[in-house]
A protein has these predicted regions:
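Transmembrane alpha-helical segments and their cytosolic interface motifs
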Residues: 20-36
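Hydrophobic alpha-helical transmembrane segments
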Residues: 41-57
Length: 295
């Protein structure tokens, strides 16, 4: 058994205890609901108010059960994330409720400004001297619909749901480079370029402040690495080099760092969980952000 699996044994024990309490309270709520519905049928004359009064009791147990699920997220998941992160990175900070700020994403010009923004699972740290920030983000746009009778409804459909990475390296560059599968939201002042790779041109659109800067980063090997990274993710992917930063947006409709409350925290669960974390150093290693080029 690995050292990490030994460390998570107490967390799995806590999970079992919390889930037992969760299941117990949910069972009580279900049984009480069945009894109340049965009484309602028997005493139909008392009607709605009879049911409403007694439904307060099973609702109480449902809320109590939910409190155990919330405690799992606030304590066990938090401890588990810190265990994994501290094992892989330096200067680690994690906050389940925090995210990369909307303004940071807006200023890249890669995606349109959202009407509603949310995020979670913010991670900050360093790996081999490269600092990084990453979080889940969800971007929504406001849409109005008017039917044939003039009734207006407003919805906020999601157009970006996934992960946003920000890597910072010692060297500051003067140019700007955007690599996207579709045209970026803002390409003002940038030149559209093609590479000698047909496979790369077919997959990505390339915009840069100047040609020399673009191909300083986009060597043939680097283009291969970007294509490999694209294959690692479902959905679309965005790259943005500016100053001493690299932004990567992954729009894959996925929630990262999820640990199921109902399932054991075992080797299989940890493999999937660590896979989400390992994407962070994989990008640093694959794009060689630790090389002299970025120092």
């Amino acid at each position: 058994m690995s050292e990490l699996l030994k460390k998570i044994e107490p967390l799995e024990k806590k999970r079992k205890e919390l889930f037992a309490q969760f299941s117990k309270n949910m069972l009580i709520a279900v049984i009480l609901t069945i009894i109340i519905v049965g009484l309602f049928i028997l005493f139909l004359e008392q009607g709605f108010y009879f049911v409403l009064f007694f439904l307060i009791v099973p609702i109480f147990f449902v809320l109590k059960a939910q409190s155990y699920a919330n405690k799992f997220k606030e304590t066990i998941k938090n401890e588990l994330v810190h265990l994994v992160l501290n094992d892989k990175f330096d200067d680690v900070y994690y906050d389940r409720h925090q995210s990369i700020p909307q303004g940071v994403i807006d200023q890249t010009g890669l995606v349109k400004r959202p009407d509603r923004f949310s995020g979670e699972d913010f991670i900050k740290g360093t790996y081999k001297g490269v600092s990084f920030e990453v979080s889940d983000v969800t971007l929504r746009e406001r849409q109005e619909h008017v039917d044939s009778k003039g009734h207006r409804t407003v919805t906020y459909p999601v157009y970006f749901k996934g992960r946003w990475y920000v890597y910072k390296f010692p060297k500051t560059f003067k140019g700007t480079l955007k690599i996207c599968e579709t045209r970026p939201n803002n390409a003002k002042g940038l030149e559209k370029l093609d590479t000698e790779s047909m496979a790369f041109n077919k997959k990505f659109k390339l915009y840069a402040s100047d040609k020399q800067y673009a191909f300083y980063h986009l060597t043939p090997i680097m283009m291969e690495k970007l294509l490999e990274l694209e294959k690692l993710h479902r959905g679309s992917i965005y790259f943005y080099y500016t100053g001493n930063e690299l932004h990567i947006g992954v729009n894959d409709s996925q929630d990262y760092l999820e640990i199921p409350f109902r399932k054991a925290i075992d080797e299989k669960a940890m493999k999937a969980f660590e896979g989400d974390v390992d994407l962070i150093p994989a990008i640093i290693n694959e794009l060689k952000l630790t090389s002299d080029k970025f120092k």
